[in-house]
Amino acid sequence: MLPANRKKLAGLLVILLAGLTLVLWWAHAPNASLRTVLIPDTYAQRREVKWPHRGQIFDRNDSLLAYTGPRYLLVLPRRKWLDSARFNRLLNWPDSALEARVNDLRRRELPMQLNLTVSEADTLRRHCREWPALTVREYTARNYTVHVAAPVLGYAYNAAQPFLYQAQRLARGRFYRLRNGGLETYYNTLLAGHRGAYHPLLDALNQRHGSWATDTTYQPGQDLHLSLDTELQAYAERIMGERKGYIVALEPATGEILCYVSAPTYDPAALTALSRGRERSALLLSPDMPLLNRPALQANPPGSVFKLVNAAVALQLRAITANTGFRCDQSLINCVHEHPNAHNLTQALKYSCNPYFYRVLQSVVEYIPDTLAQPVDTCAVRHQNLAAWTRHVKSFGLDTLLGVDLPREKSGFVPLPAYYDRRYGRCGWQYRTIYSLSIGQGEINLTGLQTANMLAIIANRGWYYPPHFVRSVGTSGAPLPRFRQKHHTLVDSVHFAEIIPGMVAALGHGGTAELASLADVNISVAGKTGTVQNDEGDDHANFAGFAPADKPKIVVAVYIENAGFGGLSAAPCAALIMEKYLRGNIAPKRKRWENWLRCGNLAEQGH
């Protein structure tokens, strides 16, 4: 090799060794500031977004109810022939299944799309070369593992846009009444979490040098652990069948809702599934209004169940005592069945004597203390007494929002003296004008949640926690703070102890709720029947009670429209719910009731 070439080669080797030495020194430089000597002071702006995963929903036994995951749609070709028989065999579908599913789709939905299971989607992907005209589309959606508790689970508004559009177009005036987002809407902020947006300034070595914009903190979606007992919920929906009404069951010691049925029922996935538009239309246009959240939004006269509150308030105001007796004078008001005169409050509750409670409220409204000077202004006294009665009644959580964790609820209605003043004039009304309040009729209206909460107050001897569905948010192990605040009524606890014996007697021999007795399985039940008058058809059946009577673990309120006497339909229904929750199974003698109650009352079945 020539000397000149050797010199060039040696020079190149020296340069390479010097460069390698510089790189090694650079990587291990003790002072980072030394690295900036040869680098210009310029940075790259980057935006990084971290999206949270929506929280899951579990029941009280930690069974998964709702989660976000993949779904699959089969997009059918518009004008290409498809061998349906071969297609059905491929997916193990029955003969003509494809034609039936296509016919169920609304004609205006183009292209036609069918829901697929995971296994069906995998099968089509494996055979995609044999079916080039078919497309399997994957998208992320909310999945429900159960077909119950639709008004409770609800929907997120961004996922229910097709339903909301249909509701505004088809339901028109009923849209607001039928809209109910459930827990998915009420806890949307907690379930959805918050995306994190980061704005780092990066140098040539990809090292961060602060932020070029304000960062937002990432918050993952939190899980919800409900108080709902899914097994009890499914059982309650099954025995209600297609009848109209509601069932609310809660734990009185905590206010946790165990069961919440608004009948007729529907599948919670129906409102958000892309291919179920026809089903949504049927739900919106149904005259039975299955989308109406009845326990929270339908306020009705409570009927004779309200006699419990009237008795408690009269005891507190000293208008009566537990030993007060009144004759069953049907010249005042009719009594629906024959029974002996009630010589005390226990007997009056057992027989649900209308004339007795007519006299009870009359004793409250027309009570004149001996200390008042004569002559007495009876109009002023009547206003004062009714105002006191209203104040005590409202302390039971009536005529107010209980604050349940649902987007919407009604407050019900309890009339004030001013209501009757506007209607009849200040002194234009007397007790005879308002006597219907004594038996839970007339102007008073309660929701199903209020009825159940009213019985929880009696079970607790005068206090309650607001009813709620979520017993734990995220990993906190606790509900929202406001659901841990105890509320007290204006009635002393001693007076509730005077009411409960009559509620127990109502389920004994000769009582109005004898069919709801669980004495054969050693469970003592306390309750009260109600038959709500209906001028447009059959009366509505009502019952509310709790068990065991001495240490209540469950409160149940049942309201069945057009079912007649409460003791023949609503009371047996409540008994089944209590027995299912407390024992886990139903005694053989009551097992046959399950199908009977789906279509009528026990009297119609020859019980």
Model region roles, listed by residue range:
Residues 1-275, 299, 322, 385-395, ...:
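Periplasmic/cell-envelope proteins involved in peptidoglycan metabolism and beta-lactam response
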